[in-house]
Amino acid sequence: MNSQQFPRQAASMPSPQVSNSGASVGQNVQGQGDEVARDMDVQSRDLLGAGTVLPSRDDKQEPVVVRPYPQVQMFTSHHPLQPAPSLTMTAQPAHLTSAVPLSFSENILKQTSKSTMPSRPIAPAPPSAMSAVPKVSGQGTVTMESGLPQTSAIPVATISGQQGHPNSLHHIMAATNVHMSIIRSSAPGPPLHIGASHLPRGAAAAAVMSSSKVTTMLRPASAQIPSAAAAQSATQHIIHPPIQSRPPVTTTSLTPAVVATVSATRAQSPVITTTPAHAAEPVLRPTLSIQQHPPPSAISIQRSAQARDAATTRITLPTHPALGVQKPQLHAMTQKTLFGTGNPVAAATVAPILATNTLPSVTTSGSAPHTQVPTSTIVSMTMPTHSSHATAVTASNIPVAKVVPQQITHTSPRIQSDYGTERGNLIPIPGHRASPNPMTMEARSENRQPVPVQLQYFLPTYPPSAYPLAAHTYTPITSSVSTIRQYPVSAQAPNSAITAQSVASTVHLNQMQLINMDTSHARHIQGIQPAPVSAQGIQQSPFSAQGIQATPISTQGIQPTQMNTQAIHPATSITNQGVQTSSVSSQQASSEPKASVVLAEGATIVANPINGAFNATPGGTTVMQSHSQSPGIGSSPAQGSSPRPSILRKKPATDGTKPKADLHAAVAPGVTGDPGIADQPSAAASLPSSHHPAAAVPSPPSQPASGSMPSSIHITPATIPALSAPPPLLSNAPSGAVMPEAKVKEEAEPMDISRPVSVPLLPPNSISSPLTVLANNISIPVGELLPGASPRKKPRKQQHVISTEEGDMMETNSTDEERCHAVKPLTSRPEKRKSPPKEYIDEEGVRYVPVRPRPPITLLRHYRNPWKAAYHHFQRYSDVRVKEEKKLTLQEVANQKGITCRVQGWKTHLCAAQLLQLIKLEQDVFERLTVLQEGLVPKKKTATDDDLHRINELIQGNMQRCKLVMDQITESRDCMLKVLDHKDRVLKLLNKSGASRRLSKVKQKDKM
């Protein structure tokens, strides 16, 4: 995504990563270098995590730069990866504060952007601008730390509407603050945000999202103001302007100065909980998580004053050794900053993923390090690609927003356990951007304890299927809790990432995450990089918490983690092809199979577990499926596609099914059987591929490490054309990846097309196979399309679904905590709401139970205008046909029941008898009248009496009438009875014709 977003911004990629922190820097830098290179290549993701993030992730968990800890050092090994092209890392302070602008060589950026999404109109905003993020202004732009560059990417969309800031948000966590606001309602921007929200990776993504038009430009943070810049860098691509209304959202900078200590924030709002929440919401969330782990206090997120507008907010995560980086550096956190890596997650869409959880618990122990911190990383979730996703752009129509992650947050509760205070991970970020996929980053921090592995979700298991399934449900597995909260869909898995630690890979549930995407694929995108982490996770090292990232270092020496690959962030490349190449995988050079999975862009990808693929072969990268499905996928719209929602997006030629095939193939090899299992990590990877391929990319993280990384990306390319630039982005993502938690909302239930998509993560090298499974998850949100389904059709279907399914839409829209209606995509406004259905307990033990808004009760709702009433009313003569009477044959008449009785004429006789009675009555009257008449007639006619005469006449008349009646009735009766004269003949005929049948029956009875 980043690259998409920032393609133009070569410089943009701030080195911040390097800056991450002193020690970190070293490590980061190395990692970053690679990452950067990768980013550059990928460019797509570049903002996402700018190299930093990725490396961080490699560390193990803490992909995000945010981790202030020296983690980076671990990455040192990664250095080789450094190869990234000129990516310049500023050696800014590790702190977030430094806004280290990441510089990507223009070439790389361009390259990436070109290859990936030429179309993507998003241009990175100049770093300064970034800072300013004019659009964002309200936005809580959180600047990701420079270290987080990667992160920054995420923030972009994520923030989206959060902005808001500063105050409340920061409280929440400084970082959070921004997002918080989003969550809250905050930002006016939200409407815009919606679109942006999705964007997973960086502001750019957000921008894309936000503005329908390409218009959005993200500027790289690089130039940005130092402070702001630092934050910004990550953000840099803030979408701000492009973002349209929600520019702010874009704000990437997670970094917000920590205005408040994260720890405190936690309490502040369950939702936000973590600082990360703010700005990049998605990103942040992850960040949040990160913060979580460390002591609350440690995390202090500062928000620069300017932060509000610039969203420079810095987040300082607590430094935790766990991170690998030295604890001391609290601010180092900058590095961590919100998961620089995670940032990508920020891509709003992904937020749900919230890798966050993944990291968090990595470290079980309370030890300071708690790799957990990396958890934040999870944020990686970064949907970056997502962001790219046109989806954002569509903001309004895109359902994406739907995604509204429901905040994986629920997991948070679990997390909470470890660090009660830290709330960060909760960070719902829901508000953010209304984006459908609000990231919900739920940084979750995973304070949860490490419980690490637990995750293991293996979302994969259900991966593909689940997604489509309930968008709402998100399986979010919240990794932290070991529980797998199996929200069906939720990509949640992230946790696993965290736990992975040892597990390595820790699978990111990502795939779950994806799921949601539902609708908005944005969500899926969500994607979250987690995968990467998970891949890394493999590393046993304690980092494991760090999850992947660190792990790479440790375990892999290779550092395969190099999420860079991840950087791939499919968004960019994928978008085009969907491929996303996952070059990461190729990176594989290391032996890691990590194969980046890139998740395929499209839902298509879903099936493919890329991960596995790459697991299987490091090169695997193959995964890349570009499955360009992209359109469907949240992944950035392919190729410069417009911001329009993926659903609407036209598929690039590349997009066609072909990539998909690749994907599958890749997967098969790598994954093969594994998917189900390995996937754990993979899940992370699974990240919402849909949303942003970038996320998908994350899987690559695993890819090998060191130096090769950058190149590896390239290598992958062979496999996956699209791949090219994305990897770097990816890498950033990885750190974020760690936070697989983000659950993608499954937002859209049926509709959510994106949701299903999960990007498989590329799990840690070792884990790799698990990863693959995730990829599968990626299925298209919409209809759980089969992997085979053609992407082309899907989108249309999705759109339809979106418009039809109010519930889904609504859900997506809202965030976990509060349904953020912020901006529902025009098309799917109703759907947004669905996201929420997830239950979670925040760190403070407050239990949030999603309440599904019930539609108003209306009789009309179920009223259908039936045609029944018109059935008997005819409008033209032709409508009526006179029924012809059937003439019976003698045979038929003879066979009628009771025919003989009728022939006897009993009715006629009955009637005749009654007529006879009438005649008798008349006769009686006649006789009486006769008697009366005789009595009245004077015997003597001498005296004529008029009265008597008159009476006499009347009697005479009545007598005549009686005679007449009697005669007529008698006649009628006689005529009537004459009918019976033929009775004998009729009986004869009937017996003849009816005999055969009757006789046969009689005979049969006799025989019986």
UniProtKB/Swiss-Prot annotation:
Residue stretches of biased makeup (Basic and acidic residues): 35-44
Keyword Cell division: no
Region entry Disordered, spans: 1-44, 113-134, 415-435, 617-720
Principal location listed in the UniProt entry: nucleus
One GO BP annotation of this record: negative regulation of transcription by RNA polymerase II
Keyword annotations of the record: Nucleus, Repressor, Transcription, Transcription regulation
Compartments where found: Nucleus
Low complexity compositional bias, start-end: 678-697
GO cellular component: Sin3-type complex
This protein's record includes keyword Nucleus: yes
Biased composition (Polar residues): 1-31, 618-644
Role description: Acts as a transcriptional repressor.
Membership in a protein family: Belongs to the SAP130 family.
Name of the protein described by the UniProt record: Histone deacetylase complex subunit SAP130-A
Organism of this sequence: Xenopus laevis (African clawed frog)
Origin organism lineage: Eukaryota, Metazoa, Chordata, Craniata, Vertebrata
